[in-house]
Amino acid sequence: MKKKIVSALLCVAMAASLVVGCGSKSGSDSGSSKGGDKLVYWAMWSEDEPQAKVIKEAISKYEKDTGVKVDVQFKGRTGQREGLEPALSAKQQIDLFDEDVNRVNGSWGKYLLDLEDMAKDYESEHGNETLFKIALNAYGQTHDGDDTLHSIPYQPSIFGFFYNKTLFTKAGIESVPTTWEELDAACAKLKEAGITPITADDAYLTSFIGYHLARYIGQDGVKALVTGEECNGESVTWDDEKVKAAAESFADFAKKGYFSKNIATNKYPAGQNQEFAPGDAAIVICGSWLPNEAKDSVAEDLEWGYFNYPSVPDGKDDNTANNIANQVLAINKDSKMADEAFQLIEYITTGEYDKKMTEDALCIPTDKANSDAWPTELAGVKEAFDATTTFYDWAAGVESNNDITPVLQENTQKLASGKLDAAGFIKVMKEAAGQ
């Protein structure tokens, strides 16, 4: 597909050079560009991030191959999240943009071009079935079940527990925990060996408690719990026995001293970079972007391991339900350069530059043709990723009510540090929810 488009664009460019002075249409339904136009791409990365550096290399090759100039603007997370929608609403030229799959397909969904036909060849040749399913679902959730494709996945990730295999071996732990009881036993061995079992950063505490609650009551139950509204037939309150059980099992780990003594004060990225990466803590809850973020702090003897959040007794979901997500690239429905934008998507997300992204940014490959290109640091993630059959939203939906999310984060930190027991946690959350 890429070769066909490149050839077509080169032919158009040659023909244009022979008919200087002849009249031409100002635009076309196909979205092809006029001579001298630039493709404008707003990127979520900061310019010094490895992802941005690979993208710049892909753009350079794209410009050389096609003659199409690209104005790439690296906005960073804050710049993208605060500036993109106002710019799109004001009809500013932005042909291509990216961000996380739910934000693009949900919050910015009305600006997206339908890619169903344009991406058919791409999907069959390069598309990861799981990632495309997530992208389709993300759009459908906020558009009355419309499951047409409006974005192309890249930079996939999974959220769960990373662990230090070296420390597990030192503590005599022979198998990866798959249940809460097995995690309890592993933490006991780590503590006995003088090793901090689990650490976490403030940025991921809502994800921590969200996952934990979802194991007991499922994601719809979590959403119903925090919003106070029924979700897909589920209605759950903070008095629910399974919610109490979740709080009690979490508090039990705090009482046993399994959580880092710094968990009450850890500000991202202190837990991952100052405790886990140097080898002071054996387990950290984080996403698969961790090896890239922590690479400058990693102990020489750290051997990377990963396991999905464990199953709990009588829980609704087991450890095959996980938050697998990705960034996505999307084309502005008003773009006059849709074909060129899609071709740039191909350059970034497939073949050489997708593989380079796995090497430089230590991320999961996007192109199914690169399925053997997982970084060594993420080798243990692949089995857990492939075993996932139920796909959680970010934090298993526990951040669905902005009014109580700050209260939840603060009191999860208190619960994990032992400053609050299970009953106290439930009481505070009931009050925050107005129950």
Q: Which functions belong to the PLM regions below?
A:
Residues 4-8, 20-111, 120-129, 175, ...:
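Conserved N-terminal structural module of periplasmic/extracytoplasmic solute-binding proteins
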Residues 60, 65, 69, 89-90, ...:
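Extracytoplasmic/periplasmic substrate-recognition and gating elements
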Residues 74-83, 180-184, 263-277:
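Short helix-initiation/N-cap motifs at beta->coil->alpha
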Residues 101-159, 184:
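Hinge/lid segment of periplasmic solute-binding proteins
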Residues 116-134, 218-245, 296-299, 311-320, ...:
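Short, solvent-exposed loop/beta-turn-alpha elements that line the ligand-binding surface or hinge
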Residues 144, 322-323, 359-371, 376, ...:
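C-terminal capping/gating helix-and-loop segments adjacent to ligand/active sites or protein-protein/ligand interfaces
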Residues 144-154, 159, 184-235:
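Extracytoplasmic/periplasmic solute-binding protein
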Residues 187-189, 231-264:
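Glycine-centered hinge/linker elements that transmit conformational signals in sensory
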